[in-house]
Amino acid sequence: DALRRFHEMPMPTHWAPEGINDLDFDKIRYYLAHGTAPYKSWEDVPDDVKRTFERLGVPEQERAFLAGVDAQYDSETAYNNMREELSKQGVIFVNSTEGLREYEHIFRPWFGKVIPVNDNKFSALNHAAFSGGSFIYVPKGVKLSQPLQAYFRINSESMGQFERTLIIADEGAELMYMEGCTAPKYDSATLHSGVVELVALKGAKIQYVTVQNWATNVYNLVIQRGLAMEDAEIRWIDCNIGSGLTMKYPAVVLQGRRARGEVISISLAHSGQLQDTGARMIHAAPETTSNIVAKSISIGEGRASYRGEVNVLKGMKGCKNNTECDALLINATSRTDTYPAISVNGNASAVQHEASVSQVDEEMLFYMQQRGLTRAQAMSLAVNGFINDLVKEFPMEYSVELRRLIDLEMEDSIG
């Protein structure tokens, strides 16, 4: 049924970037396993897979500051482990396939409820082809002091990765989940089309952090949506640096009174890249609050677009939204676009949207170069200053990595 829906539903060409039409679904491999199993011990992971994740620093980070790790290699989870004390508290952290099989009574009621199969063409594709991803359940009142983390690696040519992540925070529970995404570059197109569903029950808090650094041959077409019940909070902290085309709009449906939603977004588009990112906030209950802060950087002929939706449903009162959208153009050929959609159908609500576009000041760069910095160093300093207030929202380990990646992009752009 899901595959039939995928074939019947049209591509979102009425608003999506033109580059999406170049994707040939017939040339994508929809499942590729390497004989791996979700090992619980790092020593048991096959050597070739282990070497890949060791270069990414997975075992060191797990020992240093993580409560649990899930590492996916192409279509399947290669490694999954969680600290023993969390298991004793009833926390579940497994791959989604195992979650469906072993914890069906928790998994099944919410699977596909936040993002149904008929939501759009790519949700149907994910329903038909999904494998891997994370399933997390945090019991009532349990608050995790350390983050859980997942790594997604596409290591093969012409691959399609269709992980499915479902995170449920029971009443009063709190957690942070972080994911990193990487892939080597190939000449042929690769597709990443994951689905993420978050459920924050009464008074729960979920923070979902992403640093995406796919290779530029990757189409990054993902759907991420959270459901926040009464007094719950969902925060998406999102950074997109890689992929040739990204379409990504984290959303929060504010379903319960006094629910809160936030999206913090950083996008960087180099020549040959289009970062079409943004956020959606649906105020479906009174006295709900949302905040969107998005910053984009366009380098060379890179293009970054902000696409956002804020919708206060009919009859909702006392809702508040703040949206800030800032773009920085590095070169005269760089491009940015903003497509806000705001709909307020209730009374006594406040919605505000601010947007700005600026260019790097040549006089400022000249001044810094006179103080001994190279042009690349001066440019990195200017860019890091532009996004500094958002980078501070990322966990320490990710913020350091993020600054390093941006420095590398600046060096490559100047040569």
Model-derived segments and their meaning:
Residues 1-119, 123-124, 293-296:
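N-terminal amphipathic, basic helical "cap/leader" segment at the start of enzyme domains
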Residues 79-373, 387-415:
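Conserved beta-strand/loop scaffold segments within soluble protein domains that form the structured core
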